[in-house]
């Protein structure tokens, strides 16, 4: 139940060593840079006494790298979209030093400029193409007009060109037929419009204009100096030129796909550098030296010192170590969990709820064995467990996984074992019952039948819940005793243990072994414990009646324990439900004709069992966590710690480890 002990490490070194030291501690990913000033008042007070000291101001460099990062991310997105198939890189492991050796800022800037130019050129071509497509569409409709639309100068007539909606065509032509002095010719008809040329006398201009407006006649806006057919050919030629330019640019762009991994590594480096630049803002700087304060886990101290001394000789750096003050423990100190490799994957359950405070017990080791049992009991299938085991091993051995995903793989790898064990106990293999004789030997499985031993499984679920509640209360009692809150430890822990054990003895003595002595002992123990719960608040309170009321109300909490125990019946319900569903899927396929059973049936079994595995794992994960958070943690755990936040890399594309 370990929370890492923290020390405050202060570093004083020459200003030129700052970058190397920050890179060294970032590569370790186990050092949190501490904010020296918690308020502007503290900063001002120090400056007033030591005017040569000032907080590091690295915003200019920070802005530079943030701008470069934004440009790079935009172009990575542009490259990915342009590839049409999505670009990816294989995840690898680097040290921070190896990673930063792949980075060349000058070369990157050159690539960024070239790619930006290609991107802008492609955008401009796209815009020009859209314009030409619109022009081509317009000119294609008028290409059979063999005169320049805007250059007809007639002495006594006007010539107009334009279009009307096809729905108005019949009535428009009928109206024009009433004007024998108006000549009209249809040039083209599209799906929705008809295109006309009209010639009419100047003295009829007003009447014809009114007619055209009545039918929403849209005049042609022509901007070319050549006839439409010639202009149409010119537009097509320009369009072909743009297509060739676009093809050449895309070929040039495709050549940059080979540099995708380089760009991804550059982004990783920029993310790391930005993290360091942000950390620099917490430093104190003089003209020739700097001061850096950090939180470090005590167990990592030797490794941290070694890494720093690799960058800076001992005689060129001053290091001091201090234990956290009481005020820092209450307000500032981070919390890092320290457990063995078997328990570490289960830390994520604690983190999802809340980290413990610095001086509080870590509930993860106490919670882990119960979660193992509960998860296995709720999934309880040999086949499902073997599948979990196989997939977890493949994921861990065949791939370099992101840390979060690796922790999940470790988590399900461990959980596969109780799933297999409970599968044997229930005698279930992908929902099918184990044969009574295996390899010529009579099988002892199932130990418990999900059809015949439902009540036994139900009682077993409640017993497991009872044990977990007892463990939670014992942890609470020990914590309160260590804090010398002895009356509270009795009232909030040991008395409730007495009630639980007393009630257990009552049940066993009355219903199981039929022993009056056990029954009487249980009644006495439960009664004395109940009296303690009522009396202790009276002792602690100056107002005795108020204390009595508080004690009686506290005793009412026994109903909550009944509810807690009932909650554990879900272990039985989910385990039996998952097995029954799997068995039903098998029966469904068995009813199929032989031909369908060994063709469609196999595919159907795979799909249905995949669905049941997903639902079983999800249900066990959620309900298992719920039992820990509500029933178990509620007995002793407060939480509220601040997570340890070391200076590290983002690890977006690679894993960074100290080599």
Feature locations, PLM:
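Long, charged N-terminal accessory/stalk domains
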Residues: 1-367, 395, 402-405, 409
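Conserved, carboxylate-rich catalytic/transport cores that coordinate ions
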Residues: 2-7, 14-22, 26-33, 293, ...
């Amino acid at each position: 139940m370990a929370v890492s002990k923290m020390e405050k490490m202060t570093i004083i070194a020459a200003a030129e060593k700052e970058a190397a030291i920050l890179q060294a501690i970032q590569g370790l990913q186990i050092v949190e840079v501490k904010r020296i000033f918690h308020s502007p008042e503290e900063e001002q007070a120090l400056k007033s006494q030591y005017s040569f000291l000032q907080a590091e101001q690295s915003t200019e460099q920070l802005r530079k790298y943030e701008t470069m990062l934004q440009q790079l991310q935009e172009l990575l997105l542009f490259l990915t979209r342009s590839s049409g198939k999505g670009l990816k890189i294989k995840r690898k492991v680097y040290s921070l030093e190896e990673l930063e050796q792949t980075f060349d800022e000058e070369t990157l800037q050159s690539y960024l400029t070239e790619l930006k130019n290609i991107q802008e050129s492609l955008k401009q071509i796209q815009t020009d193409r859209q314009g030409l497509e619109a022009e081509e569409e317009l000119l294609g409709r008028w290409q059979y007009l063999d005169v320049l639309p805007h250059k007809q100068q007639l002495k006594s007539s006007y010539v107009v060109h334009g279009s009307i909606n096809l729905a108005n065509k019949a009535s428009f032509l009928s109206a024009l037929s009433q004007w024998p002095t108006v000549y009209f010719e249809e040039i083209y008809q599209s799906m929705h419009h008809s295109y006309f040329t009209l010639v009419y006398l100047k003295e009829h201009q007003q009447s014809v204009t009114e007619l055209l407006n009545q039918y929403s006649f849209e005049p042609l806006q022509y901007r070319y100096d050549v006839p439409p057919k010639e202009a149409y050919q010119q537009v097509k030629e320009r369009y072909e030129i743009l297509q060739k330019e676009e093809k050449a640019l895309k070929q040039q762009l495709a050549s940059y796909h080979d540099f995708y991994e380089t760009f991804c590594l550059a982004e990783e480096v920029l993310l790391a550098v930005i993290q360091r630049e942000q950390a620099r803002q917490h430093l104190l700087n003089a003209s020739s030296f700097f001061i850096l304060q950090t939180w470090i886990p005590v167990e990592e101290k030797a490794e941290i010192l070694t890494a720093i001394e690799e960058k800076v000789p001992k005689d060129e750096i001053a290091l001091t170590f201090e234990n956290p003050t009481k005020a820092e423990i209450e307000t500032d100190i981070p919390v890092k969990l320290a457990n063995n490799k078997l328990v570490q994957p289960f830390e994520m359950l604690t983190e999802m709820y809340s980290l413990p405070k610095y001086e509080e017990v870590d509930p993860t080791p106490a919670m882990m064995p119960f979660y193992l049992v509960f998860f296995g009991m709720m999934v309880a299938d040999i086949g499902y467990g073997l599948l979990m085991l196989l997939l977890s091993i493949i994921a861990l051995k065949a791939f370099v996984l992101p840390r979060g995903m690796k922790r999940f793989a470790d988590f399900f790898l461990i959980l596969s074992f109780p799933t297999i064990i409970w599968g044997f106990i229930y005698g279930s293999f992908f929902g099918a019952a184990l044969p009574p004789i295996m390899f010529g030997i009579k099988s002892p499985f199932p130990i418990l039948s999900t059809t015949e031993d439902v009540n036994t499984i139900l009682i077993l679920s409640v017993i497991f819940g009872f044990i977990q509640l007892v463990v939670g209360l014992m942890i609470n009692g020990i914590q309160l005793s260590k804090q010398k809150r002895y009356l509270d430890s009795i009232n909030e822990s040991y008395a409730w243990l007495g009630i639980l054990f007393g009630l257990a003895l009552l049940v066993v003595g009355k219903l199981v072994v039929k022993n009056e002595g056990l029954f009487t002992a249980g009644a006495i123990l439960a009664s004395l414990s109940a009296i303690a719960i009522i009396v202790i608040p009276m002792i602690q309170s100056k107002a005795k009646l108020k204390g009595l009321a508080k004690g009686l109300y506290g005793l009412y909490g026994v109903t909550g324990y009944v509810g807690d125990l009932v909650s554990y019946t879900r272990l039985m319900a989910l385990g039996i439900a998952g097995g029954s569903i799997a068995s039903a899927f098998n029966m469904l396929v068995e009813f199929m004709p032989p031909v369908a059973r060994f063709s469609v049936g196999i595919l159907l079994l795979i799909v249905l069992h995949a669905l049941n595995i997903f639902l079983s794992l999800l249900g066990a994960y959620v309900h298992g966590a719920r039992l820990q958070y509500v029933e178990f943690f509620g007995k002793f755990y407060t939480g509220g710690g601040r997570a340890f936040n070391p200076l590290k890399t983002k690890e977006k594309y690679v894993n960074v480890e100290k080599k």
